[in-house]
């Protein structure tokens, strides 16, 4: 078994939907990015790719490539799971921490776990999603952006 770690951060801006863990969350601001800017899934993809020694999402889905403009990160995650399968790996579990002052994501976590688990091919209980604040410190504390960390375990098929 192999383990990988991922991190991502995006700026909060008006006029964009807020998507976290594959779920759209009501908010006056969303995350800025080339794709849907889902920091939770981007951190998870980096963790999965890192565990397999396959680089990072910027290598596979460069922000300079118009093909990925507005991409749904669940679709990108499916592609990452496919890349793992080509190398003989499968996801086992993951643990994601979202760092944001608001919105509170607790009510949306069950849907996130379901959606991510379905793409990874694991039971939702194998997908852990937690949230914390930055205690009003730094860019997250000033509500300028949202960050996410992820750890993923993969195994050979």
UniProtKB/Swiss-Prot annotation:
Instruction: Look at the named UniProt entry and state the broad enzyme category this protein falls under.
Output: lyase
Which reaction(s) does the protein catalyse, per the Swiss-Prot or TrEMBL entry? 4-CDP-2-C-methyl-D-erythritol 2-phosphate = 2-C-methyl-D-erythritol 2,4-cyclic diphosphate + CMP
Query: Cofactor note from UniProt?
Result: Binds 1 divalent metal cation per subunit.
Pathway involvement of the protein, from the record: Isoprenoid biosynthesis; isopentenyl diphosphate biosynthesis via DXP pathway; isopentenyl diphosphate from 1-deoxy-D-xylulose 5-phosphate: step 4/6
Q: Does the keyword Signal apply?
A: no
Under Enzyme Commission nomenclature, its number is 4.6.1.12
Binding-site residues for a divalent metal cation, renumbered to this chain = 8, 10, 42
One molecular function GO term is: 2-C-methyl-D-erythritol 2,4-cyclodiphosphate synthase activity
Record's superkingdom?
Bacteria
Output the InterPro entries linked to this UniProt entry. Answer: MECDP_synthase, MECDP_synthase_CS, MECDP_synthase_sf
**Which keywords does the record carry?**
Isoprene biosynthesis, Lyase, Metal-binding
- Subunit composition? Homotrimer.
What does it do? Answer: Involved in the biosynthesis of isopentenyl diphosphate (IPP) and dimethylallyl diphosphate (DMAPP), two major building blocks of isoprenoid compounds. Catalyzes the conversion of 4-diphosphocytidyl-2-C-methyl-D-erythritol 2-phosphate (CDP-ME2P) to 2-C-methyl-D-erythritol 2,4-cyclodiphosphate (ME-CPP) with a corresponding release of cytidine 5-monophosphate (CMP).
NCBIfam families in alphabetical order: ispF
Protein family = Belongs to the IspF family.
Q: HAMAP family, per this entry?
A: IspF
Q: What is this protein called?
A: 2-C-methyl-D-erythritol 2,4-cyclodiphosphate synthase
Please name the source species.
Symbiobacterium thermophilum (strain DSM 24528 / JCM 14929 / IAM 14863 / T)
This protein's encoding gene: ispF
